[in-house]
């Protein structure tokens, strides 16, 4: 157990969350994945599984984010709030951007992070779905 003078690397902190948020907003994939453990799991909000889409491992996360930023090069998160509980943190945000096809992206959501050794070992993304009037 760490003493009062030693920070516990598993505890999520406001500073760490701000650094992770800045990395995502930089869209620098190498910078982003430096915050993940090699064996991290990232569940995307959308995908073919009940959990969305499961990404396993740093390299899979890197490739997926690189592809996402190629399609939405100006993607940007505005973090509204962080909630902390031991080695977990929740980030509440709005994300905006414009796809290569010209479609505007504007979602509200949150990420649930789990940390191990000062790095993200799990990230689970949720967002609100926007239903268009003609689809209701």
Model-derived regions, located:
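A solvent-exposed, acidic/Ser-Thr-rich amphipathic alpha-helical stretch
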Residues: 29-86
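Short charge-dense sequence patches
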Residues: 10-22, 41-44, 60-64, 119
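A beta-strand edge to alpha-helix "cap/lid" segment located at domain peripheries
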Residues: 2-12, 62-136
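Short, low-complexity N-terminal intrinsically disordered segments enriched in polar/charged residues
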Residues: 1-38, 136
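Short, mixed-charge, low-aromatic patches
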Residues: 16-26, 50-52, 67-70, 92
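Generic helix-packing signal
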Residues: 25-27, 44, 113, 127
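Residue-level detector of alpha-helix boundaries and kinks
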Residues: 5, 17, 46-49, 98
